[in-house]
């Protein structure tokens, strides 16, 4: 992808009980269809006695790949609600498998839609969401007497420090949003009276935590 996007923080699981049926949401981050199918297969292997394994995933820079399955539930009552929650929360390269153990009470079409939607949204919220931001890595090398001043500036401005190496000087590798590279370098130049060196590194995605109250509406 060439843009920043929201996705699942890490693989996680959350369970709900609705009218004696257990709904277990497994949420994860996937990049390819092969990874998505392997994720689904892993859940099925872990829960072989479940009544249903319903799932959905979205992949690609523009969500070009969207798949869902009701896995035996009435058409449109499981896979589509799961997919809808992922899309309404603007999640990309994300998957959810909701495993159901039938508890003996039928929920009806509307009840199933609400159950699978709620299982997905609470699973996403419990697992967590991050924004993947394209940032430039910069390695700043300063003398020991100036290091504390630099470290304070980075902390005060919430700039992510990826690595710090201590040799005859201190080399600090930071990650900066692409549109902030020049302003950041200018600010540090003024702060340290140009008594440092900078080496530009690659552009890479870095995770920024996001607070989310997942929506299923």
What are these regions (language model features)?
Residues 1-76, 197-209, 213-217:
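C-terminal regulatory domains involved in ligand/effector binding and gene-expression control
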Residues 47-50, 157-162, 189-197:
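A common structural junction motif
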Residues 78-127:
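Active-site beta-strand/loop microenvironment that shapes enzyme catalytic pockets
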Residues 128-146:
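Short glycine-/aliphatic-rich beta-strand segments at the starts of folded cytosolic domains
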Residues 141-159:
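Short amphipathic alpha-helix segments
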Residues 150-156, 183-192:
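Short amphipathic alpha-helices in soluble, non-transmembrane regions
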Residues 174-183:
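Terminal, non-globular segments
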């Amino acid at each position: 992808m060439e843009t920043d996007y929201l996705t699942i923080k890490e693989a996680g699981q959350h369970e709900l009980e609705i009218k004696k049926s257990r709904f277990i949401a497994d949420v994860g981050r996937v990049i390819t269809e092969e990874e998505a199918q392997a994720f689904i297969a892993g859940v099925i292997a872990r829960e072989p006695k479940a009544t249903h394994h319903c799932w959905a995933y979205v992949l690609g820079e523009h969500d070009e790949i969207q798949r869902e399955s009701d896995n035996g539930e009435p058409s449109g009552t499981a896979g589509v609600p799961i997919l809808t929650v992922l899309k309404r929360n603007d999640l990309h390269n994300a998957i959810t498998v909701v495993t159901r153990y039938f508890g003996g009470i039928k929920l009806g079409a509307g009840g199933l839609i609400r159950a699978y939607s709620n299982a997905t949204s609470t699973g996403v919220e419990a697992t967590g969401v991050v924004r993947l931001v394209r940032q430039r890595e910069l390695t700043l090398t300063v003398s020991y007497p100036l290091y504390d001043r630099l470290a304070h500036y980075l902390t005060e401005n919430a700039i992510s420090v990826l690595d710090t190496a201590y040799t005859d000087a201190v080399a600090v590798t930071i990650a900066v949003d692409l549109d902030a590279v020049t302003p950041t370098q200018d600010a540090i130049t003024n702060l340290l009276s140009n008594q440092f060196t900078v080496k530009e590194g690659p552009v890479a995605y870095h995770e920024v935590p996001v607070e989310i109250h997942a929506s299923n509406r």
